[in-house]
């Protein structure tokens, strides 16, 4: 059995175009705001907003400005927590809302990393709008599952997997031929999620999750061609922490009894 080239082509991300990430321009420095009425606390809230932009120039200015604040950040954090308590009347809200207050360097590192990941995503998709538009693979899965009744009160995939398998089997470009195809498809979905996450996306669409789950289920049904392919599946299951999934015992049995030479 050969790899499904139509499947591979559909489940491939756009190539990297470094010049396409220019839509992430340096923003203006956020304007200071009166939030709590406490000048020092409000100053830190403003500096945190500057840091969250993820742009090095604004971060450098914020970190330099923070040196002029003489009150310990821990004390300012307590004052901010007290403000939140007065506003919301909830000690839990106050505790969580003031958590990490004033930890500008840590926040800066996180913001820079998030911005780096955004650049990577936009180097493939050009704009945030394109990034969140249905990819050709998503559109194909959505079309294939049109009319399939969804199951209520399901935590993850809310399609019945038998119907999903029947629908995808009718579309050669959605059906993996080999275990390597299955891994390719799952890698596509995981990478797409990874590219979208820095922009604050939620869960994958149900039709995308259905195909990811279908590829995983097919790992138990397609015979391995070689020892190397079996090992690749084992490594994949360990890497994605899928050993506890319902299909995993059948997958392991398939890898052992597959008859590869």
Where are the language model's segments positioned?
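Sequence/structural signature of long amphipathic alpha-helices
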Residues: 1-261
